[in-house]
């Protein structure tokens, strides 16, 4: 009897184990696909998702090619899943206008993953709701034409180092990767303009600032870990935030300490002793007791107009005595954001322009003539000179940003349930603006793969359908640093093309292969020859 009882217990234990295993497997199977019915219920077309990871493998070649494929397969309104998160992708200009402008109050925030470094989380890029509005309003004055004119000499100083290195490349006559030169140059610009220090990243790569910048840009999340985070976000995201991360803590500590030291130094200096850099503009804005309102936040329209230096439009100021001043962490966040955006986007834009000029010599010749005439009139260029006197350069830059927009996708998050041109959007949904797909839509841009600066003559701009050209976004949350970014690009090209011309060579990759992770960039560099003029 005892043997039978023991056997019965063992059988019962086995049954329980098997039953629990079956239940667990059933729950896992349900969990692996339970989030993947939302797009279908909304009537939005999308690729078939895989269990747990959604459409992660669809993007294995990068987001650039995949966005173009999404548009071709599913149209200007489609979607996908990354892990359990649903993305609604739009490249229809009328829907984009509704999201970015007409219904901005419901789409004022960017998507946050919860894994952003503290320096990014404290920047105007990722701040949310009222705090974003306060900080953005306070920072607007730092990007006025007058303030940018004060920063122009610092950028010109960094250009001198770049010209010196290009002179050696011209003398050698060898092909070289000019993207690497631009990378060093933009590091120098960011160090000077955003952090208030002087570095020479090409000749002194051991500089601590340069070393830490390289660590920032070398970081990437391993694909297996990314798949795990996307599959189990409610567990993995909080876990990743609390687990020790030596690299993250060291980078955050370095840049935060650097900013604090510079701020302490500026506090001891007189107004005349302080550098006219971006950091000082932010510090000045912090001390200001007024800011502009949301209705004046869109800087892109003005920045893309040559008439902006005729006087800024009146900005409605609101007292901000009840708003908390920028914290040191937030000031560090703005400088760090300048590092990320200024380095990646400026480097890639300069690289793409160089490639296009080298492979389109007739366009380069026309631009060289304009540059020479401009430099005769303005040997020491200022911000407003650059806005008014280089129309063909503006056209070349604009067409490059159409073909190769470095920031080729960005997100908005729906605060409440709403409808956008008849499409229901649930609260919490992430909308992704597919700038790359929009810029390569033949309906709006005939022969989109052809480099044609004539698309951006003054007359042609008037014929463009609104919200079909978005290299800097649009609306109140468009790129805050658009003026400064264009200033760096245009001043650099002006200085370089006044001394050199670009030539394609056997090492030049045609067509250019692209890589798209956080930003669009040349995959294998840009190899050209450079010739002294």
UniProtKB/Swiss-Prot annotation:
Subcellular location: Endoplasmic reticulum membrane
Signal peptide annotation: none
Residues that bind heme: 479
Entry's EC annotation: 5.3.99.5, 4.2.1.152
Superkingdom of the source species: Eukaryota
GO CC aspect terms: cytosol; endoplasmic reticulum membrane
Subcellular location, principal: endoplasmic reticulum
Segments in the Cytoplasmic topological domain: 1-10, 97-223, 357-533
GO BP terms, alphabetized: icosanoid metabolic process; intracellular chloride ion homeostasis; positive regulation of vasoconstriction; prostaglandin biosynthetic process; response to ethanol; response to fatty acid
One MF annotation (Gene Ontology) recorded for this entry: monooxygenase activity
Record membrane topology: Multi-pass membrane protein
Role summary: Catalyzes the conversion of prostaglandin H2 (PGH2) to thromboxane A2 (TXA2), a potent inducer of blood vessel constriction and platelet aggregation. Also cleaves PGH2 to 12-hydroxy-heptadecatrienoicacid (12-HHT) and malondialdehyde, which is known to act as a mediator of DNA damage. 12-HHT and malondialdehyde are formed stoichiometrically in the same amounts as TXA2. Additionally, displays dehydratase activity, toward (15S)-hydroperoxy-(5Z,8Z,11Z,13E)-eicosatetraenoate (15(S)-HPETE) producing 15-KETE and 15-HETE.
Record's protein name: Thromboxane-A synthase
Organism: Rattus norvegicus (Rat)
Gene: Tbxas1
């Amino acid at each position: 009897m005892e043997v039978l009882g023991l056997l019965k217990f063992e059988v019962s234990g086995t049954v329980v184990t098997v039953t629990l295993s079956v239940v667990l497997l059933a729950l896992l199977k349900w969990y692996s696909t339970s989030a993947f019915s939302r797009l279908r219920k909304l009537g939005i077309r999308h690729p078939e998702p895989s269990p747990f990871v959604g459409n992660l493998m669809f993007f294995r070649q990068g987001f650039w090619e995949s966005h173009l494929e999404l548009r071709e397969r599913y149209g200007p309104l489609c979607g996908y899943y990354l892990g359990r998160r649903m993305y609604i992708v739009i490249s229809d200009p009328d829907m984009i206008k509704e999201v970015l402008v007409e219904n901005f109050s419901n789409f004022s925030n960017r998507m946050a993953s919860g894994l952003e470094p503290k320096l990014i989380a404290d920047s105007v890029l990722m701040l949310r709701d009222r705090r974003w509005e306060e900080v953005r309003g306070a920072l607007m004055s730092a990007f006025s034409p007058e303030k940018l004119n004060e920063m122009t000499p610092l950028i010109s100083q960094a250009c001198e180092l770049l010209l010196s290195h290009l002179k050696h490349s011209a003398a050698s006559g060898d092909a070289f990767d000019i993207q690497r030169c631009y990378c060093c140059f933009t590091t120098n610009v960011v160090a000077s303009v955003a952090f208030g220090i002087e570095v020479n990243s090409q000749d002194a790569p051991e500089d601590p600032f340069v070393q830490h910048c390289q660590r920032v840009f070398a970081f990437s999340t391993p694909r297996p870990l990314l798949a795990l985070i996307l599959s189990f976000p409610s567990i993995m995201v909080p876990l990743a935030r609390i687990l020790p991360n030596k690299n993250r803590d060291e980078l955050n500590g370095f840049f935060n300490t650097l900013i604090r030291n510079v701020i302490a130094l500026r506090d001891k200096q007189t107004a005349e002793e302080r550098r006219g850099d971006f950091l000082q503009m932010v510090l000045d804005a912090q001390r200001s007791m007024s800011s502009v309102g949301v209705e004046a936040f869109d800087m892109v329209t003005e920045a893309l107009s040559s008439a902006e230096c005729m006087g800024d439009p009146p900005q409605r100021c609101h007292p901000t005595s009840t708003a908390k001043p920028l914290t040191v962490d937030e000031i560090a966040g703005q400088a760090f954001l300048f590092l990320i955006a200024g380095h990646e986007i400026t480097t890639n834009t300069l690289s793409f322009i160089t490639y296009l000029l080298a492979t389109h010599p007739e366009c380069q010749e026309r631009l060289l003539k304009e540059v020479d005439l401009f430099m005769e009139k303005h040997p020491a260029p200022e911000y407003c000179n650059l806005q008014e006197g280089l129309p063909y350069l503006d056209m070349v830059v604009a067409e490059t940003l159409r073909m190769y927009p470095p920031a080729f996708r960005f997100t908005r998050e729906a605060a409440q349930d709403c409808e956008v041109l008849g499409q229901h959007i649930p609260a919490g949904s992430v909308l992704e603006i597919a700038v790359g797909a929009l810029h390569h839509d033949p309906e709006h841009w005939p022969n989109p793969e052809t480099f044609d600066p004539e698309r951006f003559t003054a007359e042609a701009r008037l014929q463009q359908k609104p919200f079909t050209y978005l290299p800097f976004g649009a609306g109140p949350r468009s790129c805050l640093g658009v003026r400064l970014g264009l200033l760096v690009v245009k001043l650099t090209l002006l200085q370089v093309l006044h001394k050199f011309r670009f030539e394609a060579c056997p090492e030049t990759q045609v067509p250019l292969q692209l890589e798209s992770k956080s930003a669009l960039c040349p995959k294998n560099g840009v190899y050209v020859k450079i010739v002294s003029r």
